[in-house]
Amino acid sequence: MVVGLLGGSFDPPHPGHVHITREALKRFGLDRVWWLVSPGNPLKPRPPAPLARRLAEARRLMRHPRVAVTGLEAEIGTRFTAETLAVLQRRYPGVRFVWLMGADNLAQFHRWERWRAIMESVPVGVLARPGAGLRARTSPAARRYASALLPEAEAARLGRSAAPAWCFVNLPMMDLSSTEIRATGRWRG
């Protein structure tokens, strides 16, 4: 089984998250996607809304038989993605995991704790985001792992590829972001 992992604050979850999840299922040869709604993001200056609220809203929004919305990081007590991946790989030895991220995250991936360990442990599926394509494609992580890049036409192989492997896919984009939703006051933490 191949499971895509979409981690994030989901503060708030929105239709853009649903869109990239559905696209990831189609493009990367995934059997399932697990949303990992994180307790917090070490790279963000302010804490998110309460986890229970974000989980409830994510579950209300993401209704798909092949997608599970989870609070796994809070349950297992991990703070960083590399730690979470190590625990999941030990806990589910028969599952092949693919880390999913928007292009905006690839652009600053080199700031993540143990980002190279992430690239070396699981394939990574990168989904285009408005305004982030060039920054992502020229980022330190993209340059460092340029030889591991799969062509977009071979994206369906990603889930069966050995790490390091990554693929950038273009897709119809939705110009939504949690940051912008919070700024409008439509979501209160």
From Swiss-Prot:
It comes from the Bacteria. The keyword Secreted does not apply. Pathway: Cofactor biosynthesis; NAD(+) biosynthesis; deamido-NAD(+) from nicotinate D-ribonucleotide: step 1/1. Pfam families: CTP_transf_like (PF01467). SUPFAM superfamilies: Nucleotidylyl transferase. GO terms for molecular function: ATP binding; nicotinate-nucleotide adenylyltransferase activity. It catalyses: nicotinate beta-D-ribonucleotide + ATP + H(+) = deamido-NAD(+) + diphosphate. The keyword Protein biosynthesis does not apply. Coiled coil: none annotated. One of its GO terms (biological process) is NAD biosynthetic process. Keywords: ATP-binding, NAD, Nucleotide-binding, Nucleotidyltransferase, Pyridine nucleotide biosynthesis, Transferase. Its EC number is 2.7.7.18. Belongs to the NadD family. Catalyzes the reversible adenylation of nicotinate mononucleotide (NaMN) to nicotinic acid adenine dinucleotide (NaAD). This is Probable nicotinate-nucleotide adenylyltransferase. The lineage of its organism: Bacteria, Pseudomonadati, Pseudomonadota, Alphaproteobacteria, Rhodobacterales.
